[in-house]
Amino acid sequence: MRLRNIPDALERIQNQNLLVKTPWNIDDSWIIEIGMGKGKMISQLAFDNPNKNFLGVEKYPSAAVKAIKYVKKYNLSNFFILISDAKDLLDRIKGKASTIWLTFPDPWPKNRHYKRRLTYKDFLEIYANLLVKDGILKLKTDNLKFFEFSIESLKENGWKITYQTNDLHNSLVNSSNIKTTYEEKWVNLNYKIHYLEAIFI
């Protein structure tokens, strides 16, 4: 579905004091979601973990502005937004996080676009530099081919997969899973969600 443009989206995010100034300094208390969309999952994580800090990275202000309603709903003070393309994160963030989430990234299914996939080696190198030692990269996707590509890419580029499942909602980790807006849509259509956790070694 096409994202409706909201002309004043960036201004509205700024007015809520959610927009970070770059370079933004972080430490191991931070958890990052890349491609947070409307922010449903990360805002719930922020509410459930008040002693952690959360940074939602989103390329499109018109999507990110939707997170404001969750900030108000949960009265969050530990959640912030960075408007950025993933390829620019090492210039925008200084320090290392404990966890990075990739939630339903564009699978770029055409072979000629494989370098755009967020689990291509160039992006994995960025994540490795943004995570503390033994920091965790977590991936959720509904696209099996993208999931299989991601597994191979991780293995080929110095990562160890510590957990994986092709059916997240019938897995051991489902009890702690928080659904994204996109995830809820596909689960209602009986799609299986693929999930993995990995560390850089």
UniProtKB/Swiss-Prot annotation:
The lineage of its organism: Bacteria, Bacillati, Mycoplasmatota, Mycoplasmoidales, Metamycoplasmataceae. Keywords: Methyltransferase, S-adenosyl-L-methionine, Transferase, tRNA processing. InterPro entries: SAM-dependent_MTases_sf (IPR029063), tRNA_(Gua-N-7)_MeTrfase_Trmb (IPR003358), tRNA_methyltr_TrmB_bact (IPR055361). GO terms for molecular function: tRNA (guanine(46)-N7)-methyltransferase activity. Its EC number is 2.1.1.33. PANTHER family: 3-DEOXY-D-MANNO-OCTULOSONIC-ACID TRANSFERASE/TRNA GUANINE-N 7 - -METHYLTRANSFERASE, PENTACOTRIPEPTIDE-REPEAT REGION OF PRORP DOMAIN-CONTAINING PROTEIN. It comes from the Bacteria. This is tRNA (guanine-N(7)-)-methyltransferase. The active site is at D106. S-adenosyl-L-methionine binds at E33, E58, D85, D106. Pathway: tRNA modification; N(7)-methylguanine-tRNA biosynthesis. Belongs to the class I-like SAM-binding methyltransferase superfamily. TrmB family. PROSITE patterns: SAM_MT_TRMB (PS51625). Pfam families: Methyltransf_4. Catalyzes the formation of N(7)-methylguanine at position 46 (m7G46) in tRNA. Substrate binds at K110, D142, T180, T181, Y182, E183.
